Amino acid sequence: MVLDNLGSSLRGSLDKLQGKSRLDEDDVEEIVKEIQRSLLSADVEVSLVMELSSSIEDRATGEEPPAGTSARDHVLRIVYEELVDLVGDSTDLPLKSQTILLAGLQGSGKTTSAAKMAWWFSTKGLRPAVIQTDTFRPGAYDQAEQMCERAEVSFYGDPDCDDPVKIAREGIEATADADIHIVDTAGRHALEADLIDEIEAIDSTVAPDRSLLVLDAAIGQGAKQQAREFNNAIGIDGVVVTKLDGTAKGGGALTAVNETDSSIAFLGTGETVQDVERFEPNGFISRLLGMGDLKQLSERVERAMAETQEADDDWDPEDIMEGSFTLKDMRKQMEAMDRMGPLDQVMDMIPGLGGGLKDQLPDDAMDVTQNRMRDFDVIMDSMTEAELEDPRSVGASRVRRIARGSGTDEETVRELLQQHKMMERTIKQFQGMGEGDMQRMMKKMQQQGGGGMGGLGGGGGLGPFG
């Protein structure tokens, strides 16, 4: 994930300040050097790195910590505020009728991003349409059509036409009933003159309200030239950063934002059309520093529960809070969790679980956990309806039968039953809570996630410092 190494190394440096009430010059120097090393290794431009580190150093040595605030929390607040300022605000994309033009080199992820953005707008109650104008890349039309089918959004393209400007013009007309028009353009392997000429012609034809540059998170220092060329041609209003689910450094996105004086609009976090986030600087930096992002978490939970319920009309998640908790309910919870995205991303959003705790886990911990969930699903396939409804009926002989039938071992079957008991106990605790109890519990979670900071608000999109 973008700047992930920065988050890990910063948390390590900040943890060394635990118990200190005041900072000395050596403390500040170590933190500033760590920031410089991490940002430079993430391909952030040198001038940006020096500007940020200088600002943090000046504030850390010149500002007095508020009464009752530890040295660690004082520096954490400064680093948080300066990093939010570095990444900038999110691109202004009002939820109303507009045309969005996508630009970028071949392989940057434009076509996938077009479908993902269209899906995102559709979840906000709008009617988006994707217009595919790429006549250069073989398979571009088919890929766009398939992605839009998965996103369940309107699509226009013409595989028999080799004039991208004509396709763009006719696409706008053919999808006139759409609220949002997302125009996907061709890319090249390099910034060639014909690419710039083509996108300038499309820009003149569709007159976009917003032009977004799509960048692969692995782009590195090459982002600066790309951003400058496209900005000179059509004017870039924002950046879409793709492929953040891998090991990409991501610093090139910050360089592009600085070069175009724009901002980040969306983050692509996975391969499916739902793996997209509207960029929220406060929540993003909060996650980076291990303080969670409850706003993004709640959006993912709500979406995952709705999709799970839609797939099974007979299941209602609210029933869990009123009746018994069966293995069927546990299975639905697992399905919803799977729909929330990769487990490591979800952990980053939970105050107290992301950040430092995740850093201590083995590298393969998330994969092992998700594989175990798949094992549990296979085991439940080998259980009878009565066993799924009443796990207490599963004795030793049934455990052996289920293990043989599922191709797993008895230990894993018992682990599933034990996991169910733990979840059942947790559900019962929630069942006895009123709304006020729930809010107090969430507030406590947020405070724990921020290292005990008295001023922690933890609102996700508003940032952890209110």
Swiss-Prot record:
<keyword id="KW-0342">GTP-binding</keyword>
<comment type="similarity">
    <text>Belongs to the GTP-binding SRP family. SRP54 subfamily.</text>
</comment>
<keyword id="KW-0547">Nucleotide-binding</keyword>
<feature type="binding site">
    <location>
        <begin position="104"/>
        <end position="111"/>
    </location>
    <ligand>
        <name>GTP</name>
    </ligand>
</feature>
<dbReference type="GO" id="GO:0006614">
    <property type="term" value="P:SRP-dependent cotranslational protein targeting to membrane"/>
</dbReference>
<keyword id="KW-0378">Hydrolase</keyword>
<dbReference type="GO" id="GO:0003924">
    <property type="term" value="F:GTPase activity"/>
</dbReference>
<dbReference type="Pfam" id="PF00448">
    <property type="entry name" value="SRP54"/>
</dbReference>
<feature type="binding site">
    <location>
        <begin position="242"/>
        <end position="245"/>
    </location>
    <ligand>
        <name>GTP</name>
    </ligand>
</feature>
<dbReference type="GO" id="GO:0048500">
    <property type="term" value="C:signal recognition particle"/>
</dbReference>
<dbReference type="InterPro" id="IPR004125">
    <property type="entry name" value="Signal_recog_particle_SRP54_M"/>
</dbReference>
<keyword id="KW-0694">RNA-binding</keyword>
<feature type="compositionally biased region" description="Gly residues">
    <location>
        <begin position="448"/>
        <end position="466"/>
    </location>
</feature>
<dbReference type="Pfam" id="PF02881">
    <property type="entry name" value="SRP54_N"/>
</dbReference>
<dbReference type="InterPro" id="IPR013822">
    <property type="entry name" value="Signal_recog_particl_SRP54_hlx"/>
</dbReference>
<keyword id="KW-0733">Signal recognition particle</keyword>
<feature type="binding site">
    <location>
        <begin position="184"/>
        <end position="188"/>
    </location>
    <ligand>
        <name>GTP</name>
    </ligand>
</feature>
<dbReference type="GO" id="GO:0008312">
    <property type="term" value="F:7S RNA binding"/>
</dbReference>
<dbReference type="Pfam" id="PF02978">
    <property type="entry name" value="SRP_SPB"/>
</dbReference>
<dbReference type="GO" id="GO:0016887">
    <property type="term" value="F:ATP hydrolysis activity"/>
</dbReference>
<comment type="function">
    <text>Involved in targeting and insertion of nascent membrane proteins into the cytoplasmic membrane. Binds to the hydrophobic signal sequence of the ribosome-nascent chain (RNC) as it emerges from the ribosomes. The SRP-RNC complex is then targeted to the cytoplasmic membrane where it interacts with the SRP receptor FtsY.</text>
</comment>
<dbReference type="InterPro" id="IPR000897">
    <property type="entry name" value="SRP54_GTPase_dom"/>
</dbReference>
<dbReference type="InterPro" id="IPR003593">
    <property type="entry name" value="AAA+_ATPase"/>
</dbReference>
<feature type="region of interest" description="Disordered">
    <location>
        <begin position="446"/>
        <end position="466"/>
    </location>
</feature>
<keyword id="KW-0963">Cytoplasm</keyword>
<keyword id="KW-0687">Ribonucleoprotein</keyword>
<dbReference type="InterPro" id="IPR036891">
    <property type="entry name" value="Signal_recog_part_SRP54_M_sf"/>
</dbReference>
<dbReference type="InterPro" id="IPR022941">
    <property type="entry name" value="SRP54"/>
</dbReference>
<comment type="subunit">
    <text>Part of the signal recognition particle protein translocation system, which is composed of SRP and FtsY. Archaeal SRP consists of a 7S RNA molecule of 300 nucleotides and two protein subunits: SRP54 and SRP19.</text>
</comment>
<dbReference type="GO" id="GO:0005525">
    <property type="term" value="F:GTP binding"/>
</dbReference>
<dbReference type="InterPro" id="IPR027417">
    <property type="entry name" value="P-loop_NTPase"/>
</dbReference>
<dbReference type="InterPro" id="IPR042101">
    <property type="entry name" value="SRP54_N_sf"/>
</dbReference>
<dbReference type="InterPro" id="IPR036225">
    <property type="entry name" value="SRP/SRP_N"/>
</dbReference>
<protein>
    <recommendedName>
        <fullName>Signal recognition particle 54 kDa protein</fullName>
        <ecNumber>3.6.5.4</ecNumber>
    </recommendedName>
</protein>
